[in-house]
Every structure is written in structure tokens, then in C-alpha cells.
């Protein structure tokens, strides 16, 4: 079975393309089932975040095109559009790619920790769908171990830097002191929680949290002395916001140009800084055309993010060394799996010969034969039966002059010398 990783990320595809290829969490189990049934993949997992959509598959050699074609058809994408931004990683490269992603080495913000939780979620969805088998199961467990090792043994995780942090950093550049500002947070997931934490740490004046699930909004708002509102009441409160950060799982925009225009009129056109971290986007792109709106999406944050890379470069080099070692360790395990069916077949054959020889010995004992004689004959017969086929095959190899096969036989039987 061949390992295959393929997909798009923030480096290869714009947010406009990435939002076409995302998978809503509630659709992942059915999508995984469909992927396996239609493409012929034996194992599969899907990682879908704001910055990347990646598929990890175990499939037969030659099935690569089928699984990629499934992804294209599932989202109804034009072949040329997908081809321009799609990357593929087979086998050894697939393992390396997943380990790098889990360790934060392939993230927009180098070393960010949120991706590991997202990979664990992808693994859980695969388990739920029944598409995680022996190989992918082992790969994901190994990935979790390596990501933890990278965090423990390097400084890759020092200084809390993330897309949320980049958004707050940009807000500070625009407003300077945040004490007199009100931040309006849309959503209540991990990214919004991080943004709230960074805003609170940087002294933001007020925090409002809007979410479909009001209980989650209350839980988040209470942590930072803010207040919560249902998402449906967002238009009523938007005029209070100096800063808007949005990250929901909505498949359609939830904040349109008309709503923002009304909020600006109420604010007497005092500017609003908006960051749309969601993919698909929560805020209609046309909102950015308004004169008093400063709208940024995840791609726009790249410049801010780049400034934070320098402190983690040395740690990233250390992490790459750890990953190099662990890729080889995992591939050694994969290679041993090719021998498992052979080992099972050989042991099964040997066990059958053992049973037959043992049954024959028991009959002779029941007939009153001398036990020592029976044991001697049992050992003799079992040795002959076990060695009959290997001996015949070795003679045949010798007759054909197959030196490589004969050398392999020496290794298999652990014979480091023989007499001519």
C-alpha cells in the first residue's frame, strides 16, 4: 500500500480558492466514506482548516489520480484551477509532510500549536468514519508523539505567535493603545479564544462575543470580562466595535456590506478595523470597499506574520533534524509491514507441520512405543518436514547460479558462514 498526502495550503492557493475546497466538520464522516468507496483508497483522513485542506490516504499503487479526481469532483472544481495549486507527497515525503505540519513548520505562523489539535480532530473524524486503518493509525499516533517531542526539545513553541496574535498585533499598530477600543469577536472557537486572550493581555477596553451557541459565547466572554450576544443580534451591536475579528464555520458570509454601512452611519463614520480569519470568509469582500473600513483576511496577515519568524528559525532547524530521524523510523516500520503476510504464511505452515508431527507422536505413544524413541523420531521428522521445502528451493537456486538469493537465504537463516 502506498501512502499519499495531497492538497492545497496558504502557500499554494489564495483564500478564494481555499474556501472552495474546504470541508465543513459535520460533512467529514460522510465525505471520508465517499472517498474510500469511490476512489478505491483503503484508508483516508481529511485535514481541513482555514489555511489548508489536505487528504492523507493509503491506496494501491496507481490510484493517486483517482483520489485526486475524487477531490476535484466532490467540490466541482475546474481541473486547471486545482492543478495550479495542488501538491502531492507520496510515501516517504507524505510522512515528512505530516510531521512538519503537526510540528508547526508548515504553518503561516512558524511553530503555531493550534494545527496539532486540528490534526487530532482529523484523526478522530477518520476513526468515526472507519477510514483509519493500521497504517494511517500508526502514522497519526507517531505524528502526535513527534510533535510533542519537537515542542519539548526545541524552543519552537516559545512566544505565543498565531494568526490571532498577528491580528491583534496589526490592531495595535493601527490604534496604538487598545484601552479605549471595543473588540467585537464573531465565533467562539479556538482561534477567537486566542484573539480574545491576546486582546485582553494587551489591555483592550471592552470585548463583545457573538456566536450562534450563546452558552459558548457566555463562557468565552466571562473569561475576559466581556459580554455575549446571539449571532442574530450582531447588526444591533456592530456600531459599538472598533475592532472586528471573525472566525466561524459558516459556509456563507455572515456579515454583509449593508449591515456594515448602517453601523458606520451610527458611528458617524469612525473607522472599523476588521480581520476575517475564516475560510470560507465570514465577511463579504465588498465590505473592504467601504471608505472607513480596514478589512484584512488571513492572506493579508502574511506580512505581519513574517516579522515573527526570525526568533523561531534556529528552533525550526532543530525540529527538522528530529523529523528527519523520525521519518526514517516510521518508514522502517512501514517496510517491515511488507514482510508481515510472508511471516504469517511461513508460521502458519510451520504450525501445521508441528500439529501433524505431534499427532503422529501421540498415536505411537498410545500404541505403547518407547517414549524416548518417539521423541527422537518426533524431532527427526519435524526437522525434515520443516527443512524439506527450503532445502529443495536452495538446491534449485544453486543449480541456476542465483548467488543473491543464496546470500539472502544465509541472512534469513542467520548463518554467517558455511563450509564448501
Swiss-Prot record:
Pathway: Porphyrin-containing compound metabolism; protoporphyrin-IX biosynthesis; 5-aminolevulinate from L-glutamyl-tRNA(Glu): step 1/2
Alphabetic keyword roster: NADP, Oxidoreductase, Porphyrin biosynthesis
Reaction(s) catalysed by this chain's protein: (S)-4-amino-5-oxopentanoate + tRNA(Glu) + NADP(+) = L-glutamyl-tRNA(Glu) + NADPH + H(+)
Pfam families associated with the record: GlutR_dimer, GlutR_N, Shikimate_DH
Enzyme category, top tier: oxidoreductase
Domain notes: Possesses an unusual extended V-shaped dimeric structure with each monomer consisting of three distinct domains arranged along a curved 'spinal' alpha-helix. The N-terminal catalytic domain specifically recognizes the glutamate moiety of the substrate. The second domain is the NADPH-binding domain, and the third C-terminal domain is responsible for dimerization.
Protein name: Glutamyl-tRNA reductase
Record organism: Nitrosococcus oceani (strain ATCC 19707 / BCRC 17464 / JCM 30415 / NCIMB 11848 / C-107)
